[in-house]
């Protein structure tokens, strides 16, 4: 058996425990916890998935995360994923969750935020490349590079949440050299 998750309904109530692969194949709702990682200057961590992974190989993402395990909360899963994927232990702040219809399967997405004050040490089996981008640079990158399918919708929701809770994020005009895909 693979990774076990809780199958949930349209209100995010648990219906039972299933294999995540089966939940995806049958398009059953389950939970995913993600974190937007920011540095003290407000830049956002962007990473490229390795070419060998089964879902979205070689594509970029601005969120770190994964499935919420059986009996696990969204925040606990977000913290676990930060440690597994980036080798960091940082407090996460739950921002919101929403029902994401998803390209490969629908799921409840819990979005968190963390400010990382320590260097990241990505697991190469999870992260092939990473860089810190301003929100404006990230928006440009989403148009120029191939991001995981649900990234843009999540980013739009995140930006709306940030604008609604604290006003607009600072705008920066300088863009770094465009990250290149490895061959």
Task: List where the protein language model places each region.
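Active-site segment of metal-dependent pyrophosphate-handling enzymes
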Residues: 27, 31, 51, 73-75, ...
């Amino acid at each position: 058996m693979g990774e076990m998750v809780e199958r949930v309904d349209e209100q995010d109530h648990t219906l039972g425990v299933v294999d995540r692969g089966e939940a995806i194949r049958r398009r059953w709702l389950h939970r995913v916890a993600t974190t937007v990682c920011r540095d003290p200057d407000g830049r956002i961590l962007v990473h490229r998935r390795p070419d060998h992974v089964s879902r979205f190989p070689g594509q970029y993402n601005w969120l770190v995360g994964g499935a919420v395990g059986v009996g696990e909360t969204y925040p606990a899963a977000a913290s676990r994923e930060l440690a597994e994927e980036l080798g960091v232990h940082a407090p996460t702040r739950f921002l919101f969750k929403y029902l994401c219809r998803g390209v490969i399967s629908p799921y409840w997405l819990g979005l968190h935020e963390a400010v990382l004050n320590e260097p990241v040490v990505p697991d190469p089996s999870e992260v092939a490349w990473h860089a810190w981008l301003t929100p404006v640079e990230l928006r440009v990158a989403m148009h120029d590079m191939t991001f995981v399918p649900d990234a843009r919708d999540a980013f739009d929701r995140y930006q709306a949440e940030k604008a609604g809770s604290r006003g607009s994020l600072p705008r920066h005009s300088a863009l770094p050299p465009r990250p290149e895909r490895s061959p």
